[in-house]
């Protein structure tokens, strides 16, 4: 990819991920460039000057070199769940943002030695009928040694199995998305499951389980992908044998108090639990419809009693702080990844390096000369190289 194409690709994606029009970008840059010029940059017909490139970098809070660096991965969206009224502009913004975030995660994986996504079970579970989702959910639980107990943290479990959980600010019409980052020979490097910020914990958990279904299921022709993914998600959160044991194999009635207890137990909404009972033929179709009308009348579709707190991702913060502590990325890069100011002490290596650079030039030369003499003596004596792990060597 040429410099022009790389800049064009990066610029357009950044603009769309921020939901900016060309006019809005011109305004945010203080009108140092015209809308027509920006359009040419995005089409690869012209390159911005160094001054304009630096202004773009300041506007988007990235380094200028970001625009010149070729993407190491491309992102494919293998599951996109949205309302029909979601505009193309909103869809482009969401996809651009997810692409940007997932590329950053892949880079962070690489620099910290985190396993890539070659081993992920992408489309590994083939189903030909809706009931096969029960088997697929059970197989995945077995492969991941999860047992049959309810999953206490969906986010933590997914991150333990190298699947990124990404929360974004999105309009109400957005439900979720599943994406895979692949390298130049289409080997998977990472997967991401995306949900909206600000949703309840039970909705977040089912949304993640639903998107996990899009990721791992190979759905046969003629099957409704959304229904299959939903059934898989419910089966993954509430395995059939556990539901039969704790709720029963046949129920003519069930109390709302019971459902609220099971809501906490399985981390699922009352509405999703009632549907689960119907799918497992524990309740009749008539009784299922009765509960759906009751949920509508109580307005529980909008807000249920006993809402669970949304789960929080730990991988990004933990890994970004590790990379910062090891001197692999700067404070500004950490803040860009986390989207917030960093309130931690500077790593000792950075403090030492800055203290060293403040010394007079002659003093720095003396220290470096002494270190060079020590190394020369070390090698001439045939010392074991493992000894280099000890001692106070100053980076410069």
Stretch-by-stretch model annotation:
Residues 364-396:
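Short linear interaction segments
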């Amino acid at each position: 990819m040429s410099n022009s194409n790389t800049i064009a690709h990066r610029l357009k994606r950044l603009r769309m991920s921020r939901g900016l029009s060309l006019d809005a970008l011109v305004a945010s840059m203080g009108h140092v460039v015209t809308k027509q010029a920006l359009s040419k940059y995005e089409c690869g017909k012209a390159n911005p000057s160094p001054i304009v490139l630096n202004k773009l970098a300041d506007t988007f809070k990235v380094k200028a070199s970001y625009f010149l660096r070729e993407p190491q991965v491309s992102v494919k969206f293998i599951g996109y769940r949205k309302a029909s009224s979601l505009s193309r502009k909103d869809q482009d913004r969401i996809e651009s943002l997810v692409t940007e975030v997932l590329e950053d995660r892949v880079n962070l994986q690489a620099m910290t030695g985190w396993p890539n996504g070659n081993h992920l079970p992408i489309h590994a579970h083939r189903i030909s009928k809706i009931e096969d989702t029960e088997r697929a959910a059970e197989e995945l639980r077995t492969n991941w040694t999860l047992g049959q107990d309810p999953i206490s943290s969906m986010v933590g479990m997914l991150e333990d199995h190298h699947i990124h959980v990404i929360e974004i600010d999105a309009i109400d019409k957005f439900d979720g998305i599943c994406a895979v980052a692949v390298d130049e020979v289409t080997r998977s490097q990472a997967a991401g499951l995306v949900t909206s910020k600000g949703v309840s914990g039970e909705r977040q958990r089912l949304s993640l389980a639903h998107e996990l279904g899009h990721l791992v299921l190979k759905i046969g022709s003629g099957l409704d992908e959304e229904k299959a993914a939903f059934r898989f998600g419910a089966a993954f959160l509430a395995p059939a044998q556990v539901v039969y044991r704790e709720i029963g194999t046949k129920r003519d009635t069930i109390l709302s108090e019971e459902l609220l207890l099971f809501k906490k137990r399985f981390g699922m909404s009352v509405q999703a639990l009632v549907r689960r009972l119907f799918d497992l033929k524990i309740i009749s179709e008539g009784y299922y419809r009765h509960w759906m009308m009751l949920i509508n009348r109580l307005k529980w579709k909008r807000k249920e009693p006993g809402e669970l707190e949304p789960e929080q991702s730990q991988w990004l913060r933990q890994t970004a702080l590790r990379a910062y502590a090891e001197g692999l990325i700067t404070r500004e890069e950490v803040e860009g990844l986390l989207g917030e100011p960093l309130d931690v002490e500077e790593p000792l290596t950075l403090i030492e390096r800055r203290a060293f650079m403040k010394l007079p030039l002659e003093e720095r030369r003396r220290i470096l000369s002494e270190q060079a003499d020590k190394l020369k003596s070390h090698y001439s004596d045939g010392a074991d190289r493992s000894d280099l792990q000890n001692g106070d060597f100053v980076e410069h």
